[in-house]
Amino acid sequence: MTYLRDYGKRIWIPIYVFIIKGGDKNILVDTGLEQFIVPDDLGERYGFEVLEFEEALNRHDLTPEDIDMIIHTHLHNDHCENDYKCVNAKVYVQKKELEFLRDPHPVDHRYYPDILDDVDVVEVDGGACIEDGIDVIFTPGHSPGGQSVSINTTEGRAIITGFCCNDKNFPKTGPAIAPGVHLDLMEAYDSIQRIKNMDATILPLHDLSIGSMKSIP
């Protein structure tokens, strides 16, 4: 997760689907993997449940058909494999990310060019307001068109990062550490500094501690 640190060290990388509540629409940030295999005791070890997409939605009395909007941090396959199930959703993606998805470079195998063929895609070009209280922040580097998602909550702003990171990328003192996986290191560095310097609760996209939270805030 961290550039030039802990290379070769095995870590678990949780994959999250975030549900945004409070408005009149059912909104997701990312849709995760469709199929995955994890050790039986992993959730117990870290204090959270590991659920498949439909099962997780059902915990909130939702089905894929109930989803109105999906906001994508980026389009690596582990963030968008369940999109096609959400037949009524508009899918918000950065223009540069969509362009790369359609013509990916061989160096990055995590893009499936046809993965959004059956969904209603809305292109976003840079920072934008998606809904009242929900904005996207253009944060490229980990991917060409990554976007972090800023949400106004009852306890202030929360930001879901648009790039691969965990808590170790955000030390309490000093600059943030660039994501260890990136297509453009300098863009990745600048993006993570921008997010760290914002007055917000930062939710690192692959941090294990988030899985034990029932809601934020």
Predicted regions and their residues:
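Metallo-beta-lactamase
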Residues: 34-37, 48-51, 55-62, 66-78, 93-138, 144-215, ...
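Short, solvent-exposed loop/turn segments at secondary-structure boundaries
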Residues: 40-43, 105, 214-216
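Residue-level detector of structured alpha->beta connecting loops
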Residues: 24, 87-90, 199
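Conserved beta-strand hairpin/beta-sheet module of binuclear metal-dependent hydrolase folds
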Residues: 1-55, 148-163
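Short hydrophobic/aromatic-enriched beta-strand-loop microsegments
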Residues: 90-95, 160-162
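Short, conserved loop/helix-junction motifs that constitute active-site signature segments
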Residues: 84-87, 116
